[in-house]
Amino acid sequence: MKKGIHPDYHPVVFQDSATGFKFLSGSTVGSAETIKWEDGNEYPLIRVEITSDSHPFYTGRQKFQQADGTVAKFNKKYGLA
């Protein structure tokens, strides 16, 4: 790999703004804000709006809607049902 052309990849802490859930991961994103992690080291803190802790798909709070079929829509529209 060529030197000097790749972004700096380092550990950062992501925090869910809605739930406060935090996790440590690697990223090229930087931040002036830092936080002390469980291992005693300080890492840049990145605040995000949605993580797996608050997204409805991962939390099981997602609502599934049954879509009507084309024939059912036609019958409903013209009162044939």
Curated annotation (Swiss-Prot):
GO terms for molecular function: structural constituent of ribosome. The keyword ATP-binding does not apply. The keyword Secreted does not apply. Keywords: Ribonucleoprotein, Ribosomal protein. InterPro entries: Ribosomal_bL28/bL31-like_sf, Ribosomal_bL31, Ribosomal_bL31_B, Ribosomal_bL31_sf. GO terms for cellular component: ribonucleoprotein complex; ribosome. Belongs to the bacterial ribosomal protein bL31 family. Type B subfamily. This is Large ribosomal subunit protein bL31B. It comes from Pediococcus pentosaceus (strain ATCC 25745 / CCUG 21536 / LMG 10740 / 183-1w).
